[in-house]
């Protein structure tokens, strides 16, 4: 069987359970298949995950963010291979990971959630250095996720600086 011809659903090969699970997780439980602004909806998916991780305490929450990023790298890389397109818009687990990094170590107040969401979306779109370089030059799961992690780091710093001046 040739891997060059798309099969059912446009995937590059027939999918086993692990493949289907990877695509399902990478697309944010199929949220990424929403035709308008899938990245925005994928970012929203990160909010309930943040609340779940907050229940683990500070150290557990940070460990949970790291574990989620590693999971995102794994499933995004596998999904990208199956879909056959670099950083396909339907892959949104990276947006959720970026929001988790944005809010890591911060109280989950309505202000932080709204400002963090907005800051992350802006940083994800602008892709400040080195995010754009990572997005262009890295391949596989790390290439899909790492630019969003960088955007999340910038957004986290922005929120911390903003809160030190405002509150």
Residue ranges of each PLM-predicted region?
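Interhelical loop and helix-boundary elements at the membrane-water interface
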Residues: 2-44, 74-102, 122-153
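Alpha-helical transmembrane segments of multi-pass membrane proteins
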Residues: 51, 66-74, 98-99, 103-104, ...
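Transmembrane helix-loop junction
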Residues: 51, 55, 81, 103-104, ...
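Juxtamembrane boundary at the C-terminal end of a transmembrane helix
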Residues: 159-167
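Transmembrane helix interruption/hinge and helix-loop junction motifs
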Residues: 53-60, 105-112
């Amino acid at each position: 069987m040739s891997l060059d011809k798309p099969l059912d659903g446009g995937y590059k090969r027939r999918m086993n359970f692990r493949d289907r699970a990877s695509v399902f997780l990478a697309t944010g439980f199929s949220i990424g298949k929403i035709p308008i602004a899938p990245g925005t909806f994928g970012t929203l998916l990160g909010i309930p995950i943040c609340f779940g991780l907050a229940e683990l305490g500070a150290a557990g929450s940070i460990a949970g963010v790291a574990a989620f990023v590693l999971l995102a790298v794994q499933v995004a890389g596998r999904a990208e291979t199956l879909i056959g397109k670099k950083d396909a818009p339907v892959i949104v687990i990276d947006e959720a990971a970026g929001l988790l990094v944005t809010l890591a170590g911060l109280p989950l107040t309505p202000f932080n959630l709204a400002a963090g969401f907005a800051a992350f979306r802006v940083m994800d779109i602008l892709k400040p250095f080195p995010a754009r370089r990572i997005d262009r030059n890295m391949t596989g799961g790390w290439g899909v996720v790492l630019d969003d992690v960088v955007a999340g780091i910038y957004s986290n710093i922005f929120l911390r600086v903003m809160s030190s001046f405002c509150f």
